Amino acid sequence: MLRLYNGDCLKIMKDIKDKSVDFIYTDLPYATTQNSWDILIPLEPLWAEYNRILKDNGCVALWSQMPFSAQLVMSNPNDFRYEWIIEKTKGTGFLNAKRMPMKCHENVLIFYKKLPTYNPQKTIGHTPVHAFTKHSTDGTNYGKTHSVSGGGSTERYPRDVIQFKWDTQKSAVHPTQKPISAAEYFIKTYTNEGDTVLDSCMGSGSTGVACARLGRNFIGIEKDEKYFNISIDRFRAEGLSNKLPLVKFDNFADIIVLEADLRKQNDLQ
């Protein structure tokens, strides 16, 4: 299921059923620039809708950067759990480079009430650990024994500082576009196949593209008609049906909804 809305997320989310979403992954406006799209969404009503539509064991992952990170945490301190540090391949803030260090990371803040799905995305190819320990005590029942520790695994659990290849200025179609690889990483971490993901500020649709590739249902909301139309083109480029139906909701004149199965076009024929 692919459902796209063009309009105000606070209005549109009221039409989403209670406890129907497994994972909310979005890049809210930080309100740190003078751009028309960078306007802070009121956080209290936003959390009210998030909490209503999210399943009891659902998870919210929000992109942020200081000072917006602090605002987000303090807007819902009881549900905040931890942060991921996303290291950028290129720094930003060149105009202030002589006054302060350039910004080379953003945050993904994790919120939930009950322990959500967590599928750690292990990295592979590390050097195995084969440490031979002489006269170590494996257990008091057997006294001192010779043992091999480490098990030879080349896998490692994820750490909270990670890096993704960032879309360049030329390839990006949105000024704050985040890598599809990042969306795929967090979707695989916090959902299972067939789960429903919401992006309440989907921009050019990267989260939806990731959901299509991974077999997740997707609900996307974007207020800016320009980027909403770009997202439609990106979904079609992924091989989704070229006959996505357009539906007008009577209760929201400013909403356009598209629905389609998240299957490749050759599966639909």
Per-segment meaning from a language model:
Residues 1-221, 226-230, 266-269:
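Core catalytic lobe of class I
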Residues 1-13, 233-267:
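S-adenosyl-L-methionine
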